[in-house]
């Protein structure tokens, strides 16, 4: 996606790989929208930490990061012993797999890398195949998002007001995004519409990331408090809801996504507003049979009890230079604790359709069309 920074417009991808340095290059998303910065992780443990600490986040982006991280770890191995190489790669795999448990993209991405590297007869061959597979996963992520945009743009009409939740934009994928892909495609088609970005507490990824993306692309939008969505729906000010997903169950059509998605789905159903989920094929979990079994990440209570932001110097009389920096501010009662589940699960009966690279499907169509959607296993 094109980004204008320091008066210059350039095309960036969220995740890339530096072969010369054997490093994964990432947009430091925790600094947005106040600062645009590229960072490099020099080894697979640093790459896993970047996923855990949310330097990079979003289903496709952490999938590509994990794929590159596995290749990075494989390339760091020194020696020719295939058995020792296998043990090393398995260690790398487990470290990256445990970085964030709810999203399935990292597991699917790394399984793909392992599958493609296995025919290699030597360590060097497997290292080469690992990086080639990671690069192909990243390219496929972009192709899937492009297809989602084409299919999803048909849902958007002139004058629509569209609600989205959290960030399922290009920052959450290698490029383009899922929930935002129909918006970008519709904009290219000349359609005029307005987007409401849920702030998406506690990390405010709608307010910081989605709003920043839409501003970069000159798309009409406003940030709303999470609790305002129902009011706007009740007043007829929302025509369509499009969200992303961190894990969608192929057998049931249940969708795990950022906390608050289920609430928006309930509200949309109450007000008869179409509710769509946009996903690449790598987000589909073909193994789990019920949403209750999806591991829900519990994050630090500090995210709920306070917030990061840029200090507004206009509110202070002092010219202290420290006020130019980002700061964490506690807003909650100092003696209270908090619960911070990062995700919730939306049942299929609340979902109008799932926008996939092969078309817009009903949740119950995923399993019958599993071969077309990339399922390669057995069972029913």
Regions found by a protein language model. Name each.
Residues 2-45:
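Positively charged, low-complexity intrinsically disordered leader regions
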Residues 35-46, 158, 235-243:
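Acidic-glycine-rich active-site phosphate/pyrophosphate-binding loop
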Residues 49-56, 263-266:
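Small-aliphatic-rich amphipathic alpha-helix that forms the alpha element of a beta-alpha
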Residues 192-193, 198-377:
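Conserved phosphate- and dinucleotide-binding cores of soluble alpha/beta proteins
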Residues 31-33, 70, 169-170, 247-250:
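A short, flexible beta-alpha/helix-coil linker loop
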């Amino acid at each position: 996606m094109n980004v204008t920074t320091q008066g210059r417009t350039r095309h960036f991808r969220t995740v890339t790989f530096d072969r010369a340095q054997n490093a994964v290059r990432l947009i430091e998303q925790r600094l947005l929208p106040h600062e645009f910065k590229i960072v490099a992780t020099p080894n697979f443990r640093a790459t896993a930490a970047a996923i855990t600490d949310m330097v990079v986040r979003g289903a496709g982006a952490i999938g590509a990061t994990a794929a590159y991280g596995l290749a990075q770890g494989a390339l760091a191995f020194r020696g020719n012993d295939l058995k020792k190489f296998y043990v090393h790669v398995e260690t790398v795999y487990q470290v990256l797999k445990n970085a964030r448990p709810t999203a399935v993209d990292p597991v699917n991405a790394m399984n793909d890398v392992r599958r493609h590297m296995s025919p290699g007869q030597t360590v060097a061959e497997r290292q080469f195949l690992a990086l080639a597979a990671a690069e192909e996963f990243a390219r496929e992520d972009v192709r899937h998002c492009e297809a989602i945009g084409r299919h999803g743009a048909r849902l958007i009409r002139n004058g629509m007001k569209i609600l989205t939740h959290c960030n399922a934009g290009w920052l959450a994928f290698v490029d383009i995004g899922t929930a935002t892909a129909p918006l970008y495609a519709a904009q290219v088609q000349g359609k005029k519409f307005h987007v409401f970005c849920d702030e998406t507490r506690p990390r405010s990824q709608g307010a910081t990331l989605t709003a920043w993306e839409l501003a970069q692309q000159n798309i009409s939008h406003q940030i709303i408090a999470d609790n305002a969505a129902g009011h706007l729906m009740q007043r007829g000010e929302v025509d369509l809801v499009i969200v992303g997903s961190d894990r969608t169950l192929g057998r049931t059509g249940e969708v795990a996504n950022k906390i608050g998605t289920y609430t928006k789905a309930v509200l949309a159903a109450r007000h008869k507003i179409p509710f769509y989920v946009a996903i690449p094929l790598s987000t589909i979990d073909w193994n789990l049979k019920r949403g209750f079994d999806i591991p829900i990440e519990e994050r630090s209570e500090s995210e709920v009890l306070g917030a990061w932001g840029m200090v507004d110097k206009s509110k202070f009389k002092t010219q202290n230079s420290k006020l130019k920096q980002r700061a964490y501010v506690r807003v909650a009662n100092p003696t209270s604790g908090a619960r911070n589940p990062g995700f919730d699960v939306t049942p299929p009966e609340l979902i109008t359709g799932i926008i996939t690279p092969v078309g817009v499907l009903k949740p119950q169509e995923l399993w019958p069309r599993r071969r077309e959607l990339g399922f390669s296993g057995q069972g029913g």
